[in-house]
Amino acid sequence: MEAKLKHFTATAAFLITVLLLVGCAEENADTAFQVYLERLGRTLDLGSQTRVPHESVARPPRPGKLRLKIPADTLNTLDFMDLRGCELQVTIGKTNSSLGRLARDSQKLLLALEFLHLAPACIDYLTAAGELELAKKLDQARRQKLELLPSLIFNATLASEEFQAFWRPAPVSKEYPANTSSAVITALEHINQASARWLSGNYLADNQSFELQLSEVSGGDGGQLWRALLHQGQWLDSANAKLEQRGPLCTATRRPQSAEILPNVVRKYFIDGIQPRAAMLGRRYHQLLPPLFALEHQLRIKLPANYLGWSES
């Protein structure tokens, strides 16, 4: 009898502990969806078994696979020495140095913009000085740089390590996207606006600001947003499948009790439980990605096939 009493006491203590801990279960990004599907299953008499989705987010090709080939400059060292009297001489010297040849794509773009900004004045100077052949060669180099400008912008932005990091998938979190900021959005907007200026013939650039903007992009949440939207879509597809599996609740002669309960389930567990975060995800999408899509549109004639294949997947 004493043994049975001890067993009963231990069992009761265990059950009380479990009941006390039920409210302490940590909520995650799946919780609201699981509760909604379980309530749907009970209401529609379809069972409450749910399967947590395992979303797979495609990552863009690595920067080395995306980078567009940039031909070497047409101006050789002899031409560079002949440019005395032009501010452009310093820019060409930096470009042709060992550091210039090994520079990051962002620095190569900034040097090209500096070249395009300074070249017209140097061409005018050489022409006035009677150096017509050299002026002609410099103008040819300017035209080459101008033709390569979209490729240089692509290499420094969409094909860069910073944008690769932007698309890095992160675990789905219930705090997302409430825990984000507007800094990366501002950076993307500035990069897109600067690219538009450069492509329209205004080659001035704030080198430090551009590098800081790229750094901000690298900490952005493009991959996290993509995964969160995919995660949400898979859960809602499961909910829709349950509704389709059940079919119409009412007939001409019968209205079951579940027809009275279902609107309350949808209101409490979908409209109140899921929709607020879904709306936040929608807002984040429409704030974060439009400047990036606009940049892609500006560079569309230079986007390589592997980038297009990834972005359209």
What are the functions of these language-model segments?
Residues 2-12:
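Bacterial N-terminal signal peptides that target proteins for export
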Residues 10, 71-73, 236:
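Short, intrinsically disordered, charge-biased short linear motifs at domain edges
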Residues 13-17:
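Hydrophobic membrane-insertion alpha-helices, especially the h-region
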Residues 20-23:
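C-terminal motif of bacterial Sec signal peptides marking the signal peptidase cleavage site
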Residues 27-179:
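N-terminal Sec/ER secretory leader and immediately downstream segment
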Residues 139-295:
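Extended amphipathic alpha-helical interaction segments
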Residues 283-313:
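Alpha-helical oligomerization segments
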